[in-house]
Amino acid sequence: MTFEPSATLRDPFVLYGESFGSRLLLGTARYPSPATLEAAVQASAPAMITVALRRQGAVGDGEGGQAFWQMLKALNVPVLPNTAGCFTAQEVITTAMMAREVFETPWIKLELIGDDYTLQPDTLNLPAVAETLLKEGFKVLPYCTEDLVLCRRLLDVGCQALMPWAAPIGTGRGAVNPHAMRVLRERLPDTPLIVDAGLGLPSHAAQVLEWGYDGVLLNTAVAQAAYPVDMARAFAQAVAAGRTAYLAGPMPEREVAQASTPVVGMPFWHADNTEQRA
């Protein structure tokens, strides 16, 4: 049975003026085998697949790198190169330029790492690097934290979409600072926000979509699952369900109980109320 997310039919996912039929982006690293990766992509039908030029060796001289790249092209899914493993502005720019030439795309997921233990982005230098890439004609999707001031600065330099983390890369903890993430969504209502790191379960993805986030990017949660293909499919369904729930308008939370079944019209309801007042 094919799962058809109805929410995407009503509100297309738009990044830099381009529409996508899915709100899930999928990484291509750490899968048990290329065949598993291929099946996971087919099962989840992502909007894009991300590729780390520095780590995958997609342009290496070896046959393995060329075979990997040919397999990705055969999937017929847009490629989003990233600058994973870059710790300086120059490394980012050099990697981005190479990726644009190799993958023949202006898209780039900007990763500028500031700490090699937490893999937290270099928030001080990130806006300047993003601005440089934008001036070079890239469509930049910056990996950032949920810090509102940083995100506004990235928008100021010209980014049209942001990729805040939910938790450090690869931790699978879900949203560790839900208050800040919800504030970010509320304060930037018109900006596409894609949760980029820290999700481990489909329920984590559904949760952030329910908050109004526009999409998620996954890698380790799928690649390191016991059954990656099934997990990829589960995440795709969770993303669609979360977005549909957001569009449906969830009921407000309440501090006290409220009966879901009305008592007006039920036998003795008036008599019971009279006795309670007596």
UniProtKB/Swiss-Prot annotation:
Superkingdom, natural source: Bacteria
GO cellular component term of the entry, any: cytoplasm
Enzyme Commission no: 2.8.1.10
Keyword check for Electron transport: no
Family matches, as InterPro entries: Aldolase_TIM, Thiazole_synthase_ThiG, ThiG
Group of enzyme by EC: transferase
Biochemical pathway: Cofactor biosynthesis; thiamine diphosphate biosynthesis
Location of the active site: 109 (schiff-base intermediate with dxp)
GO biological process, one term: thiamine diphosphate biosynthetic process
A GO MF label: thiazole synthase activity
Coiled-coil regions, chain positions: none
Residues at which 1-deoxy-D-xylulose 5-phosphate binds: 170, 197-198, 219-220
Keywords attached to this entry: Cytoplasm, Schiff base, Thiamine biosynthesis, Transferase
Pfam families: ThiG
Location in the cell: Cytoplasm
Catalytic activity, as annotated: [ThiS sulfur-carrier protein]-C-terminal-Gly-aminoethanethioate + 2-iminoacetate + 1-deoxy-D-xylulose 5-phosphate = [ThiS sulfur-carrier protein]-C-terminal Gly-Gly + 2-[(2R,5Z)-2-carboxy-4-methylthiazol-5(2H)-ylidene]ethyl phosphate + 2 H2O + H(+)
Function comment: Catalyzes the rearrangement of 1-deoxy-D-xylulose 5-phosphate (DXP) to produce the thiazole phosphate moiety of thiamine. Sulfur is provided by the thiocarboxylate moiety of the carrier protein ThiS. In vitro, sulfur can be provided by H(2)S.
Subunit and partners: Homotetramer. Forms heterodimers with either ThiH or ThiS.
Family: Belongs to the ThiG family.
Protein name: Thiazole synthase
Organism: Cupriavidus taiwanensis (strain DSM 17343 / BCRC 17206 / CCUG 44338 / CIP 107171 / LMG 19424 / R1) (Ralstonia taiwanensis (strain LMG 19424))
Gene designation: thiG
